[in-house]
Amino acid sequence: MFKRWLLASTTAAVLAILPIAAQAQTNGGDIVVTYKDDITTLDPAIGYDWVNWSMIKSLFSRLMDYEPGTANLVPSLAESFTVSPDGLTYEFKLRKGVKFSNGREVVASDVKYSIERAINPKTQGPGAGFFGAVNGFADLTGGTSETLSGIETPDDGTVIFKLSRPDATFLHVLAINFASVVPKEAVDAAAGDFGKKPVGSGTLILKDWTIGQKLSFERNPDYYIKGVPYIDSVTVEVGQEPLVALLRLQKGEVDIAGDGIPPAKFLEIKNSPEGAQMIVDGEQLHTGYVTLNTQVKPFDDVKVRQAVNMAINKERITRILNGRATPANQPLPPLMPGYDKAFTGYGYDVDKAKALLAEAGYADGFETVLFSTNTDPQPRIAQAIQQDLAAVGIKAEVRALAQGNVIAAGGTEGEAPMIWSGGMAWIADFPDPSNFYGPILGCGGAVQGGWNWSWYCNEALDKRAIEADSMSDPAKVAERQAAWGKIFTDIMADAPWVPVINERRVVAKSARMGGPDNIYIDPTRVINYDAIFVK
């Protein structure tokens, strides 16, 4: 009952846009994927960007996963599971014979260790807050314990979770990368470099990594589902400008241009004879936003933050993207349960923005820094925002850096006054409104290495978020969604963000790549390396 409600209440909007697979898979083949930015880490407890997310998904396994191209939850490392009527106890039975790539069998203690590692403050991972409902969470994060009392392993094949409160998202949490299972001996042997020397039980194995050039992955011959993955190897080439990658794809040298099609080339490619076969274009649970660091002046003043919300011309930014986005007015994207269709947010109003700045004592404006990634079109969008801010007296220096450097700046207290999130965030980890709160707007994300780059912490909203996620009764689906919707519209009164756009996902693939479009814009993986194949 609990499981059925969870799936039905969170996936309907997403599943409606996903096509059904029609092609028969074939085995074999080596593919080349390109990105401009290098990969920062493949450690599942730390990696949290849209580029490494797909690779981590395929290197490791978790208790739960999703049917390819959908948001349908299914057991993975777990062979079966049960949930108590009160939603406080989850018991999982593990598949037998699943092995790490070092040859050792996966056992229950590995699950416990891996989640404790993801939560432990010493790891400095951004995903600890997802496990906040597990008993003992506060003791582990507070440093009074090294273990999690809410995870029990009575034998090698059984894992039991005891929660302090019901959590309507908990099965989804066990499917995200932070719940990936790793072997302790491999983590210890890597001596702090597990992100470059990953050992997992997923479909792929990292064979070689030349920093700044390429990563080479091979299929795991011992993966527990025979015949998966379908491809033999994946070579990820980094340092590739999107335009160069597109030209190489057209020549047959590249199979997937991971950064998509540069907006300036999109209509040309779309209208070309090969466009229909090359372009994968679909909606996604995405919001692109500007973070305003609430802990540094002048963004500690709500009037300044509200003024910035009114200063940005979002329609112009959608034109930069050739219409591949729509203006956003709240953190939640339109397809997410809880989205408030009646909410209008802050309109584009230069005069009101100037008046608010004057009220805050900044009639002559101020100087600040706007961080952005350096992959097209993000610098151009940042420059458009810079021009809009200049029109109200705010002089913003655009600092366009590699993605990893921007993420590091955002997760360092006081480092980044403003960040344009384009190319980094936020695409839902799973299709539930809570995922647009905890990591990026909740108090738990406002930590060193976290993704709450506005460093916004509203304890009253945190309490309401916990109350919303504790609504695990099937009869309270609508109530829970409404509660989340009100949380997000109330956040906008504090204006820690400027929600700018809801963008479509566009990927370019070669004609030899097979499978339905939804596995190239997978709602929980981005690119699903487990399911793609060569024709």
Regions from the language model: what does each represent?
Residues 93, 112, 119, 123-183:
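Surface-exposed binding/hinge segments that line
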Residues 34-85, 116, 197-200:
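N-terminal lobe/hinge region of extracytoplasmic solute-binding protein
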Residues 31, 168, 210, 311-341, ...:
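Detector for C-terminal structural segments
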Residues 188, 192-195, 221-268, 395:
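Ligand-site clamp/hinge motif
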Residues 37-54, 77-78, 104, 126-127, ...:
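A structural "hinge/loop" feature
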Residues 79-127, 160, 248, 298:
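Aromatic- and charge-enriched surface segment that lines or borders ligand/interaction sites
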Residues 32, 107-116, 156-162, 202-203, ...:
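Alpha-helical secondary-structure segments
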Residues 68, 145-149, 163-229, 233, ...:
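Gly/Pro-rich hinge or "lid" segments in bacterial periplasmic/extracellular proteins
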